Regions:
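Alpha-helical transmembrane segments and immediately membrane-proximal extracytoplasmic
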Residues: 1-420
Length: 420
């Protein structure tokens, strides 16, 4: 090795060490602060959820909660806020995620859950984490490239604190931005921040999201064929969910210009549907129904009604997330299909959860890791088969309109197009 080569090697090593320590520091800051925010947010969501169950009349306050949400967004000049799409765009094109988005989405999501809106929490976590990550980047005076990494780092930390799946949380933040491209420069800070955040959540008594799959069938040709057929249905459900969510939102905005009237109507519709269908199963995130779907088979209409309730809620302007409702749709569809195909209910619910999640996010690696963190390694032969097929067959639909499809799902081809 000559002197010039040695000098270059030393310079690269020096840069790597400096970069490592920089991101170690940032990961600890993000993991501790954003993880704490996420954990407290999780505790607050649990509290307002229990209040809603204890006091069913709170459902009638949903239109009022909607008015408050619209007012808050207007007063801080975030009326046109695009939610998670804004965070994704910020990483793609250096847009800013204002710090005020974090408290705004937290309060709005709490109001939505308190009064029975059908919404999740992880979409809110991505926005909170992204906004706080962007704030730290400004505080540290980072350039545009490092700001992107800090946003992803924040997303990983908050998602991990709320969901308790640190590896999937870290990978999701890097994978969801552009389909076919992984932002590996963010790997170290995202992984470290996610583990720190999950540790803080555990210290506060929050348990990781985990489901027990009691029975595993043999991975035979016949059973494999059954799961292939189910995967087609999971992919179709993914497409339907995206179409319903986006279509409902468009209907609201096309026919009701006033956001206050729009959200009041949405709240009234949720109240009406609760009494029309005679159940509270579709209010809130629906975690209890997901857990139940692993034990007993669900009716055929359960996943469809959750789609409807969620679309009416989020499309009208209420806040929260789409991910837990997505898992609800997948789990209950898989649970319904299990007896039809003569397969274990829990295993089919597990495959449905991660397959529909993959179909609407276009994140197969995250989906596979999520399956291992939530169900254990015993299910992975079945889940990876369903995930792969759902990814292929769900086309270019996505929960997030700003998500870029960089590489084709069907050929080794650069296409760089927006999702549906």
């Amino acid at each position: 090795m000559d002197k010039e080569t040695m000098f270059e090697y030393i310079q690269r090593l020096k840069l790597a060490v400096i970069t490592l320590f920089k991101w170690l520091f940032c990961s600890v800051v993000c993991g501790c602060f954003i993880g704490s925010v996420g954990a407290v947010f999780h505790l607050m969501l649990g509290y307002v959820g229990s209040l809603r169950v204890e006091y069913p009349f709170l459902l009638f306050g949903l239109p009022v909660a909607g008015i408050i949400i619209v007012f808050m967004y207007n007063i801080v000049h975030e009326a046109g806020n695009r939610g998670t799409n804004l965070v994704i765009t910020a990483i793609q094109s250096n847009d800013e995620v204002p710090g005020r988005v974090a408290p705004l989405i937290i309060v709005s999501t709490l109001l939505t859950h308190l009064c029975g809106g059908s919404a999740g929490r992880e979409g809110a976590a991505l926005q909170v984490g992204g906004a706080l990550g962007n704030t730290f980047a400004k505080l540290f005076k980072f350039d545009e490239k490092d700001t992107r990494i800090m946003i992803m780092c924040g997303m990983s930390a908050c998602f991990s604190a709320l969901f308790g799946t640190p590896i999937a949380s870290a990978v999701f933040s890097m994978e969801v931005i552009s389909v076919g491209v992984m932002y590996y420069a963010a790997l170290v800070p995202c992984v470290l921040a996610a583990f720190i955040a999950q540790g803080i959540a555990s210290a506060l008594g929050l348990e990781s999201t985990h489901f027990v799959v009691d029975e595993i069938t043999s991975f035979s040709f016949i059973n494999g064929s059954k799961f292939i057929i189910m995967s087609v249905l999971f992919a179709l459900a993914s497409i339907l969910l995206c179409v319903v969510l986006h279509g409902t939102s468009k209907l609201y905005t096309d026919y009701i210009n006033n956001p206050y009237i729009r959200i009041i109507i949405a709240g009234a519709l949720v109240i009406a549907m609760r009494y029309i269908f005679g159940t509270t199963d579709y209010l809130g995130a629906g975690s209890d129904i997901i857990a139940r779907s692993f034990v007993t088979s669900c009716a055929w209409y359960v996943f469809l009604l959750k789609m409807l309730f969620t679309a009416v809620t989020l499309g009208g302007g209420f806040k929260g997330g789409e991910i837990v409702p997505t898992l609800f749709v997948g789990a209950t569809l898989g649970s319904f299909l299990a007896p039809i195909f003569g397969l274990p209910v829990g295993l089919c619910a597990a495959c449905g959860m991660v397959s529909v999640f993959c179909g609407v996010t276009n994140c197969p690696l995250t989906s596979f890791i999520l399956s291992i963190e939530m169900f254990g390694a015993s299910t992975m032969k079945f889940t990876i088969l369903c995930i792969a097929l759902s990814y292929l067959l769900s086309g270019y639909y996505s929960l997030y309109n700003s998500q870029k499809i960089v590489y084709s799902k069907y050929k080794t081809e650069y296409i760089n197009r927006r999702s549906h």
